[in-house]
């Protein structure tokens, strides 16, 4: 079953076309990797899924994006972003806030919890799901900026998970991490997909091969090929895909 669907999705900034008639189905409780060279439209597509693209007034969008069959452009945007959370290439916790408050803040601002006890339980649950609890449970009052880069990224995952989202969008989340923390985050994604849908933007074909169930290869704003990961990597149908997965196209 498709969790997210894009139909004839087009996007431009002024006279520059960034997405050119994208059609894509993201299956529920899978990891779908969006891969392709820089400038192919991967991160832009991700930002359309939860309407972050609306932060750019010059962006013009046409076509459809559906979440469980519902038009996201007709949904309440706050509700949409609660259900479709996002993490970014550069970890972005609020550095001077405590580890606890970084996870708790969104819950409090959106009045999702009704008591201190419930808040504490939700924060702990999110940190446990992000595989960070054991590392920070004795210093929850410490500033988030004191965490390592890998820990900060997992804190951002915990912050997203606190909302109990259905979809997690991840925009090159390991680009600034060392191999050890990259492996931790990839392992985390494999665990999280049991309960949610993950869309991962990556510049690294090897990462897509390691963690994704499906891949979509984008080139110059168009989807060239989409399919099960193993099939796309071992038997690509398009010459451009073959060049990309073998390192001949950057």
From Swiss-Prot:
Molecular function terms from GO: ATP binding; ATP hydrolysis activity; ATPase-coupled phosphate ion transmembrane transporter activity
Catalytic reaction equation(s): phosphate(out) + ATP + H2O = ADP + 2 phosphate(in) + H(+)
A GO biological-process term: phosphate ion transmembrane transport
Coiled-coil regions listed in the entry: none
Cross-referenced SMART domains: AAA
Localization annotation: Cell membrane
Principal localisation: membrane
Tagged with keyword Lipoprotein: no
UniProt EC number: 7.3.2.1
Residues the entry annotates as binding ATP: 36-43
Membrane topology value: Peripheral membrane protein
Domain of life: Archaea
Keywords assigned: ATP-binding, Cell membrane, Membrane, Nucleotide-binding, Phosphate transport, Translocase, Transport
Ranges where the ABC transporter domain occurs: 4-245
Pfam families: ABC_tran
A Gene Ontology cellular-component term: plasma membrane
Position of the signal peptide: none
EC supergroup of this enzyme: translocase
Subunit structure, interactors included: The complex is composed of two ATP-binding proteins (PstB), two transmembrane proteins (PstC and PstA) and a solute-binding protein (PstS).
Family of the protein in this entry: Belongs to the ABC transporter superfamily. Phosphate importer (TC 3.A.1.7) family.
General function of this protein: Part of the ABC transporter complex PstSACB involved in phosphate import. Responsible for energy coupling to the transport system.
UniProt-recorded name of the protein: Phosphate import ATP-binding protein PstB
């Amino acid at each position: 079953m498709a969790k997210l669907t894009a139909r004839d999705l087009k996007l431009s900034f002024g006279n520059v076309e960034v997405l050119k008639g994208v059609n894509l189905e993201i299956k529920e409780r899978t990891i779908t990797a969006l891969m392709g060279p820089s400038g192919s439209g991967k991160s832009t597509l991700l930002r359309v899924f939860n309407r972050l693209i609306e932060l750019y007034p010059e962006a013009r969008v046409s076509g459809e994006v559906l979440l469980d069959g519902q038009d996201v452009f007709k949904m309440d945007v706050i509700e949409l972003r609660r259900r479709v959370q996002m993490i970014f290439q550069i970890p972005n916790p609020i550095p001077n806030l405590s580890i606890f408050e970084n996870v708790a803040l969104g819950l409090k601002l959106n009045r999702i919890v009704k008591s201190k006890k419930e808040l504490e339980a939700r924060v702990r649950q999110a940190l446990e799901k992000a595989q960070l609890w054991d590392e920070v449970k004795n210093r929850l009052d410490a500033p988030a900026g004191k965490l390592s880069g890998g820990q900060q990224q997992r804190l951002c995952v915990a912050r997203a998970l606190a909302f109990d989202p259905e979809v997690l969008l991840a925009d090159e989340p390991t680009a600034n991490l060392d191999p050890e923390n990259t492996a931790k985050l990839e392992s985390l994604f494999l665990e999280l997909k049991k309960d949610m849908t993950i869309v991962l933007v990556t510049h690294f074909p090897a990462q897509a091969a390691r963690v994704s169930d499906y891949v979509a290869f984008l080139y110059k704003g168009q989807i060239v090929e989409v399919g099960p990961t193993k099939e796309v990597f071992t038997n690509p149908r398009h010459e451009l895909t073959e060049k990309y997965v073998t390192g001949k196209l950057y």
